């Protein structure tokens, strides 16, 4: 197979992190071509996946999404981005396997812990940044 050109999206660092309770897949900006190589090495579903390449149309092939089998899928994409990420077809592929979707453009910053792998924190929805804690008169706020 042809190697990725240096500096191309397919040259992304791919990480799988696990601790015995949960596993997370961080595939960077890889395309479906690199996903095919990863599929040969994937032995079981992950707990959470960050959608490759922000959910672009050229990533997250149907076979890759099924094999990853993540019940939670994150899409790291800016609000109103010019590329239209995440692509509706990719969203549909993750919905087809029943994954819960979290998109930073809609939800803001996301947080997750293997201690409670079914819960995803959404900062914009749960703690609006414009609501600073109120300090008693004369004291200094610690935030």
Each language-model region and where it sits:
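Binuclear metal-ion centers of metallo-dependent hydrolases, dominated by the metallo-beta-lactamase
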Residues: 3-9, 79-143
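Active-site-proximal loop/helix segments of hydrolase catalytic cores
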Residues: 1-86
């Amino acid at each position: 197979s042809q190697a990725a050109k240096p500096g191309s999206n397919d040259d992304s660092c791919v990480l799988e992190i696990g601790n015995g309770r949960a596993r997370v897949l961080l595939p960077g900006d890889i395309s479906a071509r690199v996903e095919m190589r990863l599929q040969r090495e994937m032995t079981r579903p992950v707990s959470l996946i960050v959608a490759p390449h922000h959910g672009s149309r050229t990533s997250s092939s149907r076979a890759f999404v099924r094999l990853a089998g993540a019940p939670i899928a994150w899409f790291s994409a800016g609000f109103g981005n010019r590329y239209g990420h995440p692509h509706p077809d990719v969203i549909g592929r993750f919905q087809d396997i029943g994954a819960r979707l979290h998109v930073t453009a809609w939800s803001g910053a996301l947080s997750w812990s293997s201690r409670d792998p079914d819960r995803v924190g959404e900062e914009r929805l749960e703690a609006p940044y414009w609501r600073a804690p109120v300090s008693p008169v004369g004291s200094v706020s610690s935030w």
